[in-house]
Structures are given as C-alpha cells and as structure tokens.
From Swiss-Prot:
Pathway info: Protein modification; protein sumoylation
Localization per Swiss-Prot or TrEMBL: Nucleus
Gene: UBC9
Protein name stated in the entry: SUMO-conjugating enzyme UBC9
One GO biological process term: cell division
EC number: 2.3.2.-
C-alpha cells in the first residue's frame, strides 16, 4: 500500500469515527493476525424511511486499491443482490465509483455510502447492470416493488 493510500485511509477512518450518518456503519476488516486491513472495509447502509428499502440494513464491502485515492474503491453488495444497478457479482454501478465518469480523489467514504443509499431507491435506468431487476423496474413496477420489499425483510435487523 502506498503511503498516500495509507495516509488517506487512516484519515477516512478518523473522520468516520467522529462523524457518520445515523444508522450507517463502516469499519476496516480484521486480518487473521488481529490487525486492521485498512484497504478492505465492511459497511452497512440503511434503507431510507418512506421507501420500499426502509427497515433493511444492506451490507457492502469497500475495497481500496493501492492507487487510492487516484483510483476509486470497488464497492459491492453480496452476490445476487436485487437491484437494476448492481451486477450479479454484487458490484455496484454508480458514476462516482467509476474513474472514467464522476470519480474524484476528494470523494469520501461518507459520500460513497450516501450515494449508494440514494441509488437504492432511485435506480438509473440508463445504466442497467442486472437484466431481471432492470426489466422489472422498467416494465413491471409492482413486481419490482414486491421483490424489493422481500429483500428489505431479508436484511432487516
């Protein structure tokens, strides 16, 4: 890990511990030897109140490359997560996570998790990553909503 990457991730952790959005969690993963792996985090994103996603806390992994913050982290839900902008592998398709689109080195973990939370209830139909969820969202909203509610129940605490 480059010193710039390490320095930035230490700063991110410090900022997150001081100030993070209510209902969210994020922490570096512990390695087998008990030390922290600052390049891999586990986080949870609550569904917004008043949406079909409410009641669930959705787990993600955030993996930072050695080139961070020049390159964005890879952010993933569990494989098979049902959403039009999530690949079957769980990888999230979001412009702020794409270095060829809106990624900027100043983007923080807090901005990333808030962006993912917004994406849950406001999918981008022009950037489909998963055919079944995209098709339901585009053509059969009632079926889509039913599947989202089932998933919210699956991830409720």
């Amino acid at each position: 890990m480059s010193s710039l990457c390490l320095q930035r991730l230490q700063e991110e952790r410090k900022k997150w511990r001081k100030d993070h959005p209510f209902g969210f969690y994020a922490k570096p993963v512990k390695k087998a030897d008990g030390s922290m792996d600052l390049q891999k985090w586990e986080a949870g994103i609550p569904g917004k109140e008043g949406t079909n996603w409410a009641g669930g806390v959705y787990p993600i992994t955030v993996e930072y490359p050695n080139e961070y913050p020049s390159k964005p982290p890879k952010v993933k839900f569990p494989a098979g997560f049902y959403h039009p902008n999530v690949y079957p592998s769980g990888t999230i398709c979001l412009s702020i996570l794409n270095e060829d689109q809106d990624w900027r080195p100043a983007i923080t973990l807090k901005q990333i998790v808030l962006g993912v939370q917004d994406l849950l209830d406001s999918p981008n139909p022009n950037s489909p990553a998963q055919e079944p969820a995209w098709r339901s969202f585009s053509r059969n909203k009632a079926e889509y909503d039913k599947k989202v509610l089932l998933q919210a129940k699956q991830y409720s605490k």
